[in-house]
C-alpha cells in the first residue's frame, strides 16, 4: 500500500503542506494563441474542475487564461487582449438579451469569440426534476428554473461555441442547437488535491465508508442508504462519512455513533471534506441528467487513496468490472461490494492503488491540460472563418451579466 502523498514531487512533501498560490498571468501580447478569459459568477464545485484547475495548469505552461467577473472592472480588465471570453455556466435572462446581443456584436467587431462552458445538462427539459431541486437551493421556483433553462439555451444559440465534458453531453447540446460543440474531458489537479487534503489530518481511525456530493434526488442514494443500514448493523466498528450535502436518507441509515458529518469546505480547501474516507461511494440513478455526468467523484477518491464502489451509470466505462473498482446498482449489490472491501483488505488496497495510478496517469493535470487550448483554437478558428472576424482593438464592455 502506498502512503498518501507518494505521488507528490519532493518539494510538495514539505512539512507544512502549503498549497502554492495561483501563478501570475503572462503578458497577453506575448502569450501563445488562444488567449482566453473565463467569465464566472458562482463559487461552486464545477468552477474548480472547469475553470480554476485548468486555468492554473495552462498559465504554468505559458498560456494566458484569466478568470473573474465581467461586472467587476478590475477583473474584467484581464479580458483585454484575449481571443475569446468563455461564459462558465452563465446566461442572460430574458430582459437582458438585448444587452447581450449588443455585447456579442461589439466583441465580434473586435474579433473576439464568445463561448459557453457547461459540465451538466442545464438545457434539457428532460432534466427539469433535478434542475428544480438545484434551483430550490437558490430560492428559485420551478417556473423560474424552467425559464432559466430556456434563457440559457437562447444564450447558447447566440454564442459561437460550447465546451462540454463528455460526448454524451455533446450529443444533447447538438440535438438542441446548431452552435458548434467541443468536448474537453474533466481532469483532476492531482497534486493540489493531495496537498489540500493532507492539511486535514485524519481524526477518526476507524475504517470509513464515505459519500460526498451536492443535493440530489433520493433515487440516487436510496439503494446506497439501504446498504449502509445493513452494513452498519453487520460491522459496528465501521464509520460512515457524509460530506457536503447532508443527504437525509444516508444520515438516517447509520447509528449516530458510526456517523461522521462534514460540510463542504471553501473552494481553496475543498479537498478536506474527503479526509479519512477509505471506501468511496459513487451512486447515480440512470436518469437523463446523470448520464451527462463524469466520474469525477471517483477521481477525487483516487487522490485520497480510497477504493471505489460506484453505480454502472457513468462509472462502468471508467472502472471496468472489478479492475479499478466495484460496481453496484441495487441495495443487495451495494451491500455485497462494501462487505467485500471491508473483509478483504488486500483487495481494497489493490483496487485503490490501481485506480490511483490510472487517474494520475490518464485523468490528471497538467498532463491533460492541452485539451483546452486545442478545443478553444478549433472553436475560435471556425467562428472567425464563419463570421469573417478579424482581430481588432481589444475593448471590453461591463455590467450586463447574471448567472
Regions found by a protein language model. Name each.
Residues 116-149, 194-195, 204-205, 383:
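Acceptor-binding helix/loop patch of EC 2.4 sugar-transfer enzymes
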